[in-house]
């Protein structure tokens, strides 16, 4: 199960909507071995495409070095699908290289709502997992004021 702070969940959706009609991509990192996403890092889609994403290699190297320096690892690797459902494509599956990561897909194909789903992808096998939206901040503190968690499908801000 992916447990993610509401603020991080909202940042992923905001990034996906902002980059639409191109696919958005990024990572949320956390302490090694914690399975706790804490730091949101939106990345550039080097392809600038509505049907494909690829991290910019220089930016990715910088981010991965920074993670190493901070004893962090990618906990969530996310991207959006702009015209299809939030399910990994064959290309997404073939590029999944972090077996411990949660692969989040956000579909922005419908302007009225956003589909948000999480998967584990290990050795080409895709397993969907539940998503829990936490009221705690990424640092583990309760937010003030306290709000109810949003549904997994979020209305568009259009």
Region roles according to the model:
Residues 1-74, 83-158:
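Conserved beta-strand-loop surface patch within small alpha/beta domains used
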